[in-house]
């Protein structure tokens, strides 16, 4: 950037000063030392560093090729205007362009071409030049201030530099001083026509400022180093010639604005001469009586010359201290020789009011100089004053009050009171103390004024307290001799005859002088001053004085009495503010202050100064005990108050019903008319102290009227009030903002809307956002950088930014305004209406004068680095929340402001915090300010060779600075602390997150970009317990996130090679293991400290979050990340597990739980992704059990999601391998924990469901076969909620428990089953809580597999909970239309109400299977209640082949199959239903056979009847088996072949479904037909028990519901089965994939078994039914004969096919396999072995032979 200004520029003096102050980036001792070593000669040369113009220098400039010619021309013009060396002028111009120029570099050219603009530029450069000169002197002053200060960090470096300067400094600076006051003023003839009168005046102000600073340096120098007598003579002559500043060569130019500078020159001249006389060592010599040792005692000639000079002094006030000091010196060293001269000189000094002058001098220095100069001056004057008082009689020194005033000013230096109390009370200032005691308490004020000055620290405060506590004399003035005293003969002693009450109205606390007390009498102006020898405590006396004032408040004496009480209150204030512990002793006084306030505010013209003192006292007390002060104050009526409690915000903001109180009246009636605001300042400090005291909420409510008064009556209008003194208005503004700032920063009001009445914080926010108070704050922020710079420049101060001048107050006020506005926007509750404050902040003003532009221009401010920082912080906030473009607001200045931002960002010495704030602002701008960020990125576009756009970094791109900051090679050379590094990385992260492609493109092409970016990830961090810099963790977290974003968004092949190399290096160097271990140790550290002492918890969370993201990306992109080693993966998982365990075992700490919850997510994801590589399950289960216990102990609301994650992890682990109870640690405890949680959750769900029912918010019934899964907010019935997952986990645990013992124990201890069933019943009735219902049924189904479990479930009343309530799941919907089973297009796996029905059916089937006769009545009840649905379902298969329909039919037939075992009982209870079901089963068998027989017809049905295409669920189900190579991709744009394939898959799935239904249907029918053995052999069989199931017809069934199922149906079924078996053998059928088993072979085996089972049952039914016909006498013999013939031929044909098939080798029947087998008498064929299937053939052959007989 410097190159843009035309070449490198040297270090400017202002930069040097910033570095020495420690406000730059260079803060190391070595860096300070290097700067001083490099520049000490400049400091020694001082102002003569800047040379006058010379021809040789001009030639050098012209010959310099590096500087552009326009700049050379301008440099030469500057040289003439400033009278400065040409080379230095060009250098100055370059420095100015670099540091202070407010345009862009490009605009310099146009400025140079325009005469008017170039003239304005020269004038600005002149100001810059003057500032540079001043900064050299400031540097020297700074060195002299601190080079002996042990507390200063750079003392040694400063001292080394001062050693180098010491010898020549004074001579050079003295010479410069002479040159300055003798220099002729510049004129337009000598310096060009720019040198107007105004510029000459400006030059002269600078000349005077430099003179005063040079003298200040010389004064400080001589405070440390001795002045030779000859130097004193030279200086005295010089100052006399210059008239102590008043006889300037250019004195005709002096106007009143320059008086402060002229006075300062005079003051320093006088101080230098007094310091040079070395009065302190003179005092020591006199005390030791060795006067001859003093340097002036040995140099008589110089003394005589000085005498002569001194005799000519006396015409100006500045001579006074010099004359006094010299008189003292001569009087001490040669009392005899010079008595007349001494008297004359001393007399002149007293006539010049020397003490008044010294007071003025010290006051002037205190108000406008650095503390060191002031304290040095105090020491100097203290020495003089002490010696004067010791050496001379007090009465010869003029007015005693003047001496007291001077003493008080001197004692303002904190170290001097300590010194005073350590010296003899009879010498020095002790004499004046003794003197004022002689008039106490007749005259209170002088003693109290002096004692107030003598309080500086706790020890001195205690000394003052003790001094006043033990007074031994009481002084009284009498105009006439009283009657009750006896006088001594010479009248010098009086004795009291009667005791005297000193305060007749003093009340209980009083003083009484006892009888016989002796008093010394002094006659004074015809009055008697009596000094009674009486011991008392002055504090008691002060209490009496206050009591007196309270009594005379309503009389005319009040003003006179106030003058006595004010010093008392002031002293009390000083004492308790120094040492609060003394306040307890002063309770009698402080407790009366409240009454004083109350009484004095009601006086006709209130004594404002006394009231202010009282309030100041209370402020100090409030710091220690705010509640007590507040309570006592309320009763006084002094503070604003409300008559009736106000609760609504509108009433508060309108100040309705609020009373201004005593203070409000004072402000309106006394202070504003008078223009003095002592009480207001005290009031604001008091309220701020009370607010900071964090009173309770009720007391804070009491402060509302006070705060409202400030916001409504003071803040909007204080700048319009009348003011007598300069600076008070700014002070009041600053105090008001401090109060608001304190309120907005209250931490106990975190929840702004918790209580029913608005809090103070909320009140402030609303007032500032919506009332005119906010406009005032905006006006303060709008003061602007130029105004502040003008105020700073006008100050006569020597030390620039330090201290407490007008400029500093203004800067502080503006900073507070920034902070307040920032907080208001941050804390304001979100609302749709834009508040007036936000509107004013973000509106676009004309000509760039809007607030945004003003804020941005604070970047030009140089005095206080916090000001631009806070301005940028507010800009950052506005850029985030306000709907406006910062870029548009900046207007034409945008580029220039950008340059200023970047100049400060790239500067090597700039304060690090400003750089951080600039980067943070840019980070926010990436997301919210597109225009602005483009300006800062400054990317240049050019067309590439291949027609694409190529981007490169412009010269003014912020990325230069960012790349430099992250450059790992440069970090040693260029100091980049962790905070700054973090800010740079955060900016890059924002670019990645916001997908700023052009910027990312450029960055990726930068060499070593990825290497530099990721270098922190390869470092080694100190362990978490020792980390001092948590920002490093945040940096690493952001880098991890950038890597994740890059890998996630960039196509695999397009990743940069350097990034790939970096990731490979990351893996090779075992950084995964390192970071995993670090994150684990971090978790352990947080757990050990219980999350309490962790100030850096936010950074920890960021790191854990980023590490989580990195590992999740690594699971999906393992090859890119090189995380393929299963050993490493296992270790990473175990680290996460251990870390999570450590955190979640601290259930009391919210921080630990939050962090643990974050890690829990990662744990779950890794578990699911890597479950095949995690090895032993045992290592995982133990810690998981502990984690669960920790989570269950924590705050349940907080842990809701975490608990769900832990449950989910458990489920995953339990599914990883088959386990026994013994494999799981603490199995029974685990089951108990899960069940206890479930108990609570289910009860809560029950309550929630009942509550929603009460509110009438039950969801409307949906189509019964559709999924009713409307997501309800914060509902407990969530698929991933604790309740549902808990049920699934319980089911997994239940599956492990083979005999059900553990569960039996839990169900005895906890009423978990009744709770579940009750809630299940309600859920079913209301058709709510779908996920819960489904999960519960799954659990019950698992329980029902064991005898004990089934007994428990049945005993808990399962039938009542399911049987009737289940009706509401599928009954008529609210529109009254009957439901038909519709084709659900949703995945069958998604929970749905039809699914619930199916599960209920399965549960009934399982319970019946397990409990048999014990559950039969319930099963019959169930089938009876749901008979319509059952029959409907069996019928539906023919018309609807959707998966949902087939599934339901499958479940229904399964249940019927179980129930058919109990045919007799069924027939007894529900004969008609049984008959209906038998018929329907026949028709179902026929439908399935038809559909299986004609594949084309089935396909046609699937395509047309069920809508176009196939259920998506089908495609999904098909893909599930891992071996399914031909599984259809689920892309929406499939090619034709894929579509065909997926249709085929779907067809096979439906076929498989039909086949399962068919096999179960036949098995069930088999129970409704006579047993084959029985009917063949048993003649006495009761045929009436068995109905005919199939008609006597042998035609192949058509697909028509009218045709009854017949023998033809059964034969067709056998044929279909045989054909399918044949196809299976020929490997034509990919039907096996539909089975869903892992391998093709297993699928084939299962299918063959199923087909065989179907055939067996067909033959069985054929034989049984045929025999039934043959045995039935009601059947016509002709029909029997026909049947025999038909059946024989059909069976013979079938037998031959069957024999052929068996010869090839056939499978076994799965009678005991996949399907529940009939549990009645089993025939031989159900036990047929795989080797010989002949028994089946034999049976059929035997039957055929039987019939043919």
From Swiss-Prot:
Chain positions found as Phosphothreonine: 1712
Keyword Phosphoprotein tagged: yes
Keywords: Acetylation, Cataract, Disease variant, Microphthalmia, mRNA transport, Nuclear pore complex, Nucleus, Phosphoprotein, Protein transport, Translocation, Transport
Chain positions with N-acetylalanine modification: 2
InterPro entries the record matches: ARM-type_fold (IPR016024), Nucleoporin_Nup188_N (IPR018864), Nup188 (IPR044840), Nup188_N-subdom_III (IPR048883)
Main location: nucleus
Compositionally biased intervals (Low complexity): 1521-1537
Region (Disordered): 1514-1542, 1707-1733
Modified residues (Phosphoserine): 1523, 1709, 1717
Residues annotated as transmembrane: none
Record's compositionally biased regions (Polar residues): 1719-1732
GO cellular component: cytosol; membrane; nuclear envelope; nuclear pore; nuclear pore inner ring
Pfam families for the chain: Nup188_N, Nup188_N-subdom_III, Nup188_SH3-like
Disulphide-bridged cysteine pairs: none
GO MF terms, alphabetically ordered: structural constituent of nuclear pore
Disease implication from the record: Copy number variations of NUP188 gene may be a cause of heterotaxy, a congenital heart disease resulting from abnormalities in left-right (LR) body patterning. Sandestig-Stefanova syndrome: An autosomal recessive syndrome characterized by pre- and postnatal microcephaly, trigonocephaly, congenital bilateral cataract, microphthalmia, cleft lip and palate or high-arched palate, camptodactyly, rocker-bottom feet, heart anomalies, specific brain changes such as loss of periventricular white matter, thin corpus callosum, and delayed myelinization.
Role according to the record: Component of the nuclear pore complex (NPC), a complex required for the trafficking across the nuclear envelope. Required for proper protein transport into the nucleus.
The protein's name: Nucleoporin NUP188
Record organism: Homo sapiens
Gene: NUP188
């Amino acid at each position: 950037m410097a190159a843009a200004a035309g070449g490198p520029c040297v270090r400017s003096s202002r930069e040097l000063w910033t570095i020495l102050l420690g406000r730059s980036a260079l803060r190391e001792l070595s860096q300070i030392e290097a700067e001083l070593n490099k520049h000490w000669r400049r400091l020694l040369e001082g102002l003569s560093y800047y040379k006058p113009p010379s021809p040789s220098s001009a030639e050098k400039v012209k010959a310099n090729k590096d500087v552009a010619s326009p700049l050379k021309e301008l440099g030469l013009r500057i040289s003439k205007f400033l009278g400065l060396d040409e080379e230095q002028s060009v250098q100055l111009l370059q420095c100015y362009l670099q540091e202070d120029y407010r345009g862009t570099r490009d605009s310099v050219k146009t400025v140079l071409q325009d005469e008017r603009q170039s003239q304005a530029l020269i004038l600005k450069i002149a100001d810059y030049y003057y500032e540079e000169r001043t900064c050299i002197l400031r540097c020297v002053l700074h060195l002299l201030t601190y080079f002996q200060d042990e507390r200063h960090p750079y003392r040694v470096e400063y001292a080394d530099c001062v050693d180098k300067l010491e010898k020549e400094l004074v001579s050079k600076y003295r010479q410069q001083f002479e040159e300055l006051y003798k220099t002729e003023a510049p004129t337009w003839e000598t310096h060009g026509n720019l040198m107007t009168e105004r510029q000459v005046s400006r030059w002269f102000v600078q000349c005077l400022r430099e003179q005063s600073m040079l003298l200040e340096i010389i004064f400080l120098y001589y405070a440390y180093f001795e002045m030779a007598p000859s130097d004193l003579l030279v200086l005295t002559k010089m100052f006399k010639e210059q008239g102590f500043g008043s006889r300037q060569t250019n004195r005709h130019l002096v106007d009143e604005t320059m008086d402060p500078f002229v006075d300062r020159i005079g003051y320093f001249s006088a101080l230098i001469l007094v310091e040079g006389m070395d009065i302190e060592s003179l005092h020591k010599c006199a005390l030791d009586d060795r006067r001859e040792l003093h340097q002036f005692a040995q140099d008589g000639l110089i003394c005589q010359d000085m005498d002569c000079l001194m005799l000519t002094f006396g015409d100006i006030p500045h001579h006074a201290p010099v004359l006094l000091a010299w008189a003292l010196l001569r009087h001490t060293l040669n009392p005899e020789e010079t008595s007349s001269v001494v008297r004359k000189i001393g007399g002149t000094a007293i006539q010049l009011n020397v003490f008044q002058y010294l007071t003025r001098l010290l006051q002037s220095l205190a108000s406008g100089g650095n503390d060191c100069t002031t304290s040095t001056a105090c020491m100097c004057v203290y020495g003089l004053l002490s010696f004067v008082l010791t050496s001379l009689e007090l009465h010869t020194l003029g007015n005693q009050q003047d001496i007291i005033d001077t003493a008080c000013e001197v004692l303002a230096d904190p170290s001097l009171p300590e010194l005073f109390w350590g010296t003899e009370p009879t010498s020095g200032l002790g004499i004046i103390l003794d003197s004022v005691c002689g008039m106490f308490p007749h005259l209170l004020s002088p003693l109290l004024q002096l004692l107030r000055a003598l309080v500086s620290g706790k020890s001195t405060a205690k000394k003052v307290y003790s001094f006043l506590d033990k007074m031994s004399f009481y002084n009284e003035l009498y105009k006439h001799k009283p009657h009750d005293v006896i006088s001594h003969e010479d009248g010098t002693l009086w004795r009291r005859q009667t005791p005297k009450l000193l305060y007749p109205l003093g009340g209980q606390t009083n003083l009484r002088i006892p009888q016989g007390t002796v008093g010394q009498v002094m006659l004074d102006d015809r009055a008697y001053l009596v000094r009674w020898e009486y011991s008392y405590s002055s504090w008691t006396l002060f209490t009496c004085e206050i009591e007196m004032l309270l009594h005379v408040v309503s009389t005319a004496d009040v003003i006179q009495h106030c003058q006595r009480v004010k010093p008392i209150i002031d002293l009390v204030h000083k004492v308790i503010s120094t040492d609060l512990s003394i306040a307890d002793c002063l309770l009698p006084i402080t407790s009366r202050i409240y009454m004083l306030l109350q009484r004095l505010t009601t006086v006709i013209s209130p004594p404002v100064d006394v009231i202010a003192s009282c309030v100041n006292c209370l402020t100090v007390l409030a710091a220690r005990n705010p509640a007590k002060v507040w309570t006592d104050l309320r009763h006084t009526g002094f503070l604003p108050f409300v008559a009736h409690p106000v609760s609504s915000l509108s009433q508060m903001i309108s100040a309705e019903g609020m009373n201004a109180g005593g203070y409000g009246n004072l402000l309106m009636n006394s202070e504003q008319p008078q223009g003095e605001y002592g009480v207001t300042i005290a009031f604001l400090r008091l309220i701020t102290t009370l607010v900071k005291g964090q009173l309770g909420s009720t007391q804070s409510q009491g402060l509302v009227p006070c705060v409202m008064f400030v916001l409504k009556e003071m803040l909007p209008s204080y700048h319009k009030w009348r003011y007598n003194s300069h600076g008070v208005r700014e002070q009041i503004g600053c105090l008001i903002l401090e109060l608001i700032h304190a309120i907005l920063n209250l931490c106990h009001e975190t929840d702004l809307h918790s209580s029913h009445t608005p809090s103070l914080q909320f009140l402030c926010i609303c007032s500032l956002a919506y009332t005119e108070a906010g406009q005032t704050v905006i006006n303060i922020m709008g003061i602007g950088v130029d105004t502040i710079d003008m105020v700073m420049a006008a100050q006569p101060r020597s030390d620039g930014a330090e201290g407490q001048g007008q400029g500093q107050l203004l800067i502080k006020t503006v900073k507070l305004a920034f902070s307040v506005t920032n907080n208001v926007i941050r804390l304001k509750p979100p609302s749709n209406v834009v508040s007036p404050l936000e509107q004013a902040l973000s509106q676009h003003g004309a000509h760039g004068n809007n607030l945004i532009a003003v804020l941005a221009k604070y970047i030009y401010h140089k005095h206080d680095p916090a000001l631009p920082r806070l301005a940028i912080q507010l800009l950052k906030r506005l850029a985030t929340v306000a709907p406006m473009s910062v870029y548009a607001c900046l207007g034409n200045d945008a580029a220039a402001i950008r340059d200023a931002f970047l100049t400060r960002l790239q500067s090597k010495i700039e304060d690090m915090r400003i750089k951080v704030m600039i980067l943070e602002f840019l980070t926010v701008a990436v997301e919210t300010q597109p225009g602005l960020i483009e300006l800062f990125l400054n990317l240049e576009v050019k067309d590439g060779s291949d027609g694409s756009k190529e981007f490169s970094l412009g010269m003014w791109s912020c990325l230069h600075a960012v790349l430099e900051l992250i450059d790992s090679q440069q970090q040693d050379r260029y100091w980049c602390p962790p905070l700054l590094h973090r800010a740079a990385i955060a900016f890059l992260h924002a670019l990645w997150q916001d997908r700023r492609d052009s910027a990312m493109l450029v960055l990726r092409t930068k060499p070593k970009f990825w290497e530099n970016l990721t270098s922190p990830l390869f470092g080694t961090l100190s362990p978490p317990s020792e980390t001092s810099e948590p920002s490093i963790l945040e940096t690493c977290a952001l880098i991890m996130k950038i890597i994740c974003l890059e890998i996630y968004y960039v196509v695999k092949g397009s990743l940069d090679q350097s990034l790939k190399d970096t990731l490979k290096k990351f893996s090779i160097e075992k950084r995964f293991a390192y970071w995993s271990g670090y994150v684990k140790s971090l978790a352990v550290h947080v757990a050990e400290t219980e999350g309490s002492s962790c100030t850096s918890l936010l950074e920890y969370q960021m790191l854990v979050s980023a590490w989580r993201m990195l590992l999740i990306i690594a699971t999906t992109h393992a090859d890119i990340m090189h995380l393929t080693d299963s050993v490493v993966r296992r270790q990473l998982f175990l680290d996460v597990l251990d870390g999570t365990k450590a955190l979640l075992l601290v259930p009391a700490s919210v921080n630990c739980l939050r962090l643990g919850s974050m890690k829990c997510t990662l744990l779950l994801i890794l578990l699911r992704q890597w479950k095949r590589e995690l090895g032993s399950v045992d290592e995982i289960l133990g810690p998981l059990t502990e984690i669960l216990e920790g989570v269950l102990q924590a705050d349940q609301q907080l842990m809701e999601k975490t608990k769900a994650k832990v449950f989910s992890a458990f489920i995953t682990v339990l599914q990883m391998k088959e386990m026994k109870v013994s494999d799981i640690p603490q199995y029974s405890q685990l089951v108990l924990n899960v069940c206890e949680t479930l108990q609570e959750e289910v009860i809560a769900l029950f309550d929630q469901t009942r509550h929603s029912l009460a509110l009438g918010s039950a969801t409307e019934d949906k189509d019964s076969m559709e999924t009713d899964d409307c997501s309800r907010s914060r509902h407990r019935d969530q698929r991933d909620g604790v309740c549902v997952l808990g049920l699934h986990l319980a089911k997994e645990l239940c599956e492990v428990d083979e005999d059900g013992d553990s569960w039996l124990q839990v169900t005895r201890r906890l009423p978990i089953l009744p709770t579940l069933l009750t809630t299940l019943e309600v859920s079913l009735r209301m058709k709510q809580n779908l996920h819960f219902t489904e999960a519960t049924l799954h659990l019950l189904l698992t329980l029902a597999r064991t005898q004990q479990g089934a007994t428990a479930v049945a005993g808990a009343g399962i039938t009542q909970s399911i049987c009737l309530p289940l009706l509401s799941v599928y009954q008529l919907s609210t529109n009254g239309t009957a439901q038909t089973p519709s084709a659900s297009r949703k995945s069958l796996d998604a929970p749905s109400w039809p699914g619930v029905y199916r599960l209920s059916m399965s549960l009934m089937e399982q319970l019946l299977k397990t409990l048999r006769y014990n559950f039969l009545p319930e099963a019959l009840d169930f089938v009876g209640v749901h008979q319509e649905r059952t029959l409907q379902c069996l019928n539906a298969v023919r018309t609807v082949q959707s998966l949902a329909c087939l599934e339901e039919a499958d479940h229904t037939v399964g249940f019927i199959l179980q129930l058919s075992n109990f045919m007799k009982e069924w027939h007894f209870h529900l004969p008609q239903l049984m008959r209906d079901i038998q018929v329907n089963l026949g028709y179902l068998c026929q439908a399935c056979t038809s559909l299986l027989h004609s594949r084309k017809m089935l396909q046609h049905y699937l395509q047309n009847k069920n809508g176009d295409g196939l259920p998506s669920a089908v495609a999904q189900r098909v893909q599930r088996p891992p071996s399914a190579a031909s599984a259809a991709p689920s892309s929406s744009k499939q090619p034709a072949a894929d579509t065909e394939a997926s249709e085929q898959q779907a067809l096979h799935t439906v076929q498989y479904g039909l086949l399962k239904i068919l096999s179960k249907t036949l098995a069930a029918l088999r129970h409704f037909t006579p047993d084959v053995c029985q009917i063949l052999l048993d003649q006495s069989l009761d045929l009436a028990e068995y109905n005919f199931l199939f008609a006597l017809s042998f035609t192949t069934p058509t697909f028509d519901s009218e045709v009854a199922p017949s023998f033809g149906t059964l034969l067709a079924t056998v044929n279909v089965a045989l054909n399918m078996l044949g196809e299976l053998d020929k490997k034509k059928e990919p039907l096996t994939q539909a089975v869903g088993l892992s391998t093709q072979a297993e699928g084939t085996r299962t299918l063959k078994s199923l087909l065989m089972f179907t055939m067996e049952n067909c033959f069985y039914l054929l034989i049984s039914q045929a025999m039934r016909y043959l045995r039935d006498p009601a059947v016509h013999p002709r029909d029997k004969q026909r049947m025999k013939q038909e059946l024989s031929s059909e069976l013979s044909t079938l037998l031959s096919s069957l024999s052929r098939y068996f010869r090839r080798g056939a499978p076994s029947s799965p009678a005991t396999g996949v399907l529940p087998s009939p549990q009645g008498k089993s025939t031989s064929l159900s036990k047929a072995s795989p080797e010989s299937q002949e028994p089946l053939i034999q049976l059929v052959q035997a039957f055929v032979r039987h019939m043919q007989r």
